[in-house]
């Protein structure tokens, strides 16, 4: 018995449906002793909405993929679990070369589980940045409202952006929250 993690292709945007279909098939075929976990890795990110409101949302780390912890059977003769996964509506196949799926390495599994918050300490949601260094932005709130400038530095951990704005004819660096600026 070799329990490994495998990646399977799904139709993009249909990951939840494919997962639900697979979980139903696992129960229907009584394969709880062969297929242990089905995972759609996600992470929490902070998105800035109109009006500067912050919203924490879950984003898929690998759109179009499910990760399955299962016992695939021996090299020559894959077990019934392999066929059940392959025949699940919404799943297009295993990731791997040839007929035999390639298991994920322990490092890959650890990374996926850590980023998903399923292993180790849970990190604060990351801010999703809608702009890059060099982009023109407009300040929408605070003492510099209605100024425009160029992004010179982004600090996603702190949710801050440094913008060069022109004040009285001089370029001046100003540190602002992500919620205070929008792309110009």
From Swiss-Prot:
One record GO biological process: regulation of DNA-templated transcription elongation
Domain KOW: 133-163
Entry GO terms, CC: cytosol
Keywords, in A-Z order: Transcription, Transcription antitermination, Transcription regulation, Transcription termination
PROSITE patterns: NUSG (PS01014)
Pfam families cross-referenced by the UniProt entry: KOW, NusG
Family stated for the protein in its record: Belongs to the NusG family.
The protein's name in its UniProt record: Transcription termination/antitermination protein NusG
Organism of origin: Thermus thermophilus (strain ATCC 27634 / DSM 579 / HB8)
Gene transcribed to yield this protein: nusG
């Amino acid at each position: 018995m070799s329990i490994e993690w495998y990646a399977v292709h799904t139709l993009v945007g249909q990951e939840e449906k494919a997962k639900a279909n697979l979980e139903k098939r696992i129960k229907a075929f009584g394969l709880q002793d062969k297929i242990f976990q089905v995972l759609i890795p996600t992470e929490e990110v902070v998105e800035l909405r109109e009006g500067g409101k912050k919203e924490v949302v879950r984003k898929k780390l690998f759109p179009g993929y499910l990760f399955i912890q299962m016992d695939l059977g021996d090299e020559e003769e894959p077990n019934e679990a392999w066929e059940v996964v392959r025949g699940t509506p919404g799943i297009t196949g295993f990731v791997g070369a040839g007929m035999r799926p390639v298991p994920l390495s322990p490092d890959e599994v650890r990374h996926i589980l850590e980023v998903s918050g399923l292993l180790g300490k849970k990190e604060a949601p990351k801010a999703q940045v809608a702009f890059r260094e060099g982009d023109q932005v407009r300040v929408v709130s605070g003492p510099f409202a209605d100024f425009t400038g160029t992004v010179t530095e982004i600090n996603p951990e702190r949710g801050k952006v440094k913008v060069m704005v022109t004040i009285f004819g001089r370029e001046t660096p100003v540190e602002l929250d992500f919620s205070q600026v929008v792309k110009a």
